[in-house]
Swiss-Prot record:
One of its GO terms (molecular function) is NADH:ubiquinone reductase (non-electrogenic) activity. It comes from the Bacteria. It is a multi-pass membrane protein. InterPro entries: NADH_UbQ_OxRdtase_chain4L/K, NUOK/Mnh_C1-like. NDH-1 is composed of 14 different subunits. Subunits NuoA, H, J, K, L, M, N constitute the membrane sector of the complex. GO terms for cellular component: NADH dehydrogenase complex; plasma membrane. Keywords: Cell inner membrane, Cell membrane, Membrane, NAD, Quinone, Translocase, Transmembrane, Transmembrane helix, Transport, Ubiquinone. The chain crosses the membrane at residues 6-26, 30-50, 64-84. It is found in: Cell inner membrane. GO terms for biological process: ATP synthesis coupled electron transport. It catalyses: a quinone + NADH + 5 H(+)(in) = a quinol + NAD(+) + 4 H(+)(out). It comes from Acidiphilium cryptum (strain JF-5). This is NADH-quinone oxidoreductase subunit K. The lineage of its organism: Bacteria, Pseudomonadati, Pseudomonadota, Alphaproteobacteria, Acetobacterales.
Length: 102
């Protein structure tokens, strides 16, 4: 069974993580920031999968399942917070939340 070389797989994970980080830092829309965070979490999952495949261990796949469940919880809480903020301020701009109290 052919696997992806460790260096190339980790390079792919680093590129995905960098794209997600740029998305979080550059975008001001809360939904795009949340999607960029998801890309970053998936990049970490890819790194776990590649490392697990390199040493023929199922631990990488187990950690990827953990990352997926963490991402699902993060999305549900994040979307709930975005909806609550959108009800108070009818915009998705991250800078608009500076005026909120409480």
């Amino acid at each position: 069974m052919a696997t992806v070389p460790l260096g190339q797989g980790l390079l792919l994970a680093a590129i995905l993580f960098a794209l997600g980080l740029v998305g979080v830092l550059v975008r001001r829309n809360l939904l795009f920031m949340l999607m960029s965070l998801e890309v970053m979490l998936n990049a970490a999952g890819v790194a776990f999968i590649v490392a697990g495949a390199r040493w023929a261990s199922p631990d990488g796949q187990i950690m990827f399942i953990l990352v997926l469940t963490l991402a699902a919880a993060e999305v549900s809480v994040g979307l709930a917070l975005i909806l609550l903020m959108h009800r108070r301020i009818p915009t998705l701009d991250a800078d608009a939340g500076d005026g909120l109290r409480g």
